Regions:
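Beta-strand-enriched cores of mature, soluble protein domains
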Residues: 31-32, 75, 102
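Short, well-structured hydrophobic secondary-structure segments
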Residues: 34-66
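Generic detector of well-ordered alpha-helical segments enriched in charged/polar residues
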Residues: 25-36, 63, 125-132, 136-139
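N-terminal, charge-rich interaction modules
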Residues: 1-44, 141
Length: 143
């Protein structure tokens, strides 16, 4: 499920004008509620950090407030996807850039595990086939 950064925030939480602290506070309050919901068995949620309600200043305040965690994952394809654990367990900072480094998407994911990481059954089967083929090649050169 994806939501905008301030979907459930009340007007007094959002603030006005340059009050980026108030906007970040609203998002952090939303994250706390989402963590409780996911812990109770609810589905994972993504909070869009590139929408019109989430300025670069708010993103910077969120990044500072959430702090770095222990896990950093980089996926390289046509661009780069970076998934960073924050210091708040269950909150993941995701950014996707094109091959030139331009930011395409940024979102916070409240989840046990980021959605991009688990592999499906078909991917597991292909992995087993590849490993078996590699083992045949290795065993011919070792034996």
């Amino acid at each position: 499920m994806a939501i905008s950064a301030l979907e459930h925030a009340t007007p007094d939480m959002i603030g006005t004008g340059g009050a980026t602290g108030a906007g970040a506070t609203a998002i952090l309050a939303e994250i706390a509620a989402l963590l409780e919901r996911v812990a109770a068995g609810g589905e994972a949620v993504q909070i869009d950090l590139c929408g019109p309600t989430c300025s670069p200043q708010i993103r910077a305040k969120l990044l500072q407030a959430l702090g770095p965690g222990e896990v950093l994952i980089r996926l390289k394809a046509d661009g780069e996807s970076t998934i960073r654990e924050t210091s708040v367990q269950g909150v993941w900072w995701n950014e996707h850039t094109d091959r030139y480094g331009n930011l395409l998407a940024a979102f916070l994911e409240v989840a046990r595990v980021p959605a991009i990481l688990p592999v499906d059954s078909e991917q597991l089967r292909r992995g087993a086939e590849r490993l078996r083929a590699d083992l045949q090649t290795v065993s011919k050169t070792v034996d």
